[in-house]
C-alpha cells in the first residue's frame, strides 16, 4: 500500500512538535534532596517545599543534587553530583491543606479532634548548573 501525501504531511508537524519540546528544556531535570525528601526539578517550574529560610524574592541554592540530566546525558552522584547547584527563587510562604486527625475510643466516651496545616514555601527553579555552566 502506498502512503498518500496527506498522511505524510500530517506526520511532519507531529515530529516538529516533538523536537520543539526537546529544545525547550523538557528533558532537562535534576533530582535533589530538600526538606528531607527527594524532588524531581525542572527549570522554570514552581514547587512547594517544607518551610525554607528566606524572605519572598530571596535566592536559595540547593547543593544536594543527586542526579542531573540534560541533552549531553545523565550524571549520577555518589551521593551528590560534584559542583552541581540548583538555583531557586522564593515566590511565597504558604500553608498546605488542612488535615484532620480524629481519634475515638469506642465505648469509652473519649474523642479527640486535631487539625494540622503544614507550613510550605513555594519556589521557582531558575537554573540548574554543573561546574558553573548552565545545564544544556
UniProtKB/Swiss-Prot annotation:
Instruction: Offer a single GO CC term for the protein.
Output: ribonucleoprotein complex
The record, for SUPFAM superfamilies, names: L21p-like
Gene source species: Synechococcus sp. (strain RCC307)
The text of the family note is: Belongs to the bacterial ribosomal protein bL21 family.
Q: Which PANTHER family does the entry mention? A: 50S RIBOSOMAL PROTEIN L21, LARGE RIBOSOMAL SUBUNIT PROTEIN BL21M
Can you name this protein? Large ribosomal subunit protein bL21
| Region spans: Disordered | 1-25
The record's subunit annotation is:
Part of the 50S ribosomal subunit. Contacts protein L20.
Record's HAMAP family? Ribosomal_bL21
Protein origin, superkingdom: Bacteria
Any one Gene Ontology biological process term? translation
Q: Which UniProt keywords apply?
A: Ribonucleoprotein, Ribosomal protein, RNA-binding, rRNA-binding
Job description of the protein: This protein binds to 23S rRNA in the presence of protein L20.
InterPro entries for this protein:
bL21-like (IPR028909), bL21-like_sf (IPR036164), Ribosomal_bL21 (IPR001787), Ribosomal_bL21_CS (IPR018258)
